[in-house]
Amino acid sequence: MKAKPSHQATSMSSSLRVSPSIHGYHFDTAARKKAVGNIFENIDQESLQRLFRNSGDKKAEERAKIIFAIDQDLEEKTRALMALKKRTKDKLLQFLKLRKYSIKVH
């Protein structure tokens, strides 16, 4: 008994195709927005705080202040934001450990 040849390659779903050039379409890169060095360039501090708050950030005000600090260079801002993230992570781990121990005690 012989197996029937598979025609899977010819009946491939169009959702699996990655390149639009298969059908002769091209990406229109000329209409794209130009990249900027500082993504917070044209935004005020209140709007940034609101953006962080709406995304669920509990330290929105502190994070926005770090970004808008004029006397810090980019490297200092990065370190400050990473430290803020680490403090939040450490507090979460501390909370989870306390919760774990309180369950064992009761």
Swiss-Prot record:
One of its GO terms (biological process) is cellular response to heat. Keywords: Apoptosis, Cytoplasm, Nucleus. Pfam families: TC1 (PF15063). Its main location: cytoplasm. GO terms for cellular component: cytoplasm; cytosol; nuclear speck; nucleolus; nucleus; plasma membrane. Coiled coil: none annotated. InterPro entries: Avpi1/C8orf4_dom, Tcim. The keyword Cytoplasm applies. Monomer. Interacts with NOTCH2 (via ANK repeats), the interaction inhibits the nuclear translocation of NOTCH2 N2ICD. Interacts (C-terminus) with CBY1 (C-terminus), TCIM competes with CTNNB1 for the interaction with CBY1. Seems to be involved in the regulation of cell growth an differentiation, may play different and opposite roles depending on the tissue or cell type. May enhance the WNT-CTNNB1 pathway by relieving antagonistic activity of CBY1. Enhances the proliferation of follicular dendritic cells. Plays a role in the mitogen-activated MAPK2/3 signaling pathway, positively regulates G1-to-S-phase transition of the cell cycle. In endothelial cells, enhances key inflammatory mediators and inflammatory response through the modulation of NF-kappaB transcriptional regulatory activity. This is Transcriptional and immune response regulator. It comes from Mus musculus (Mouse).
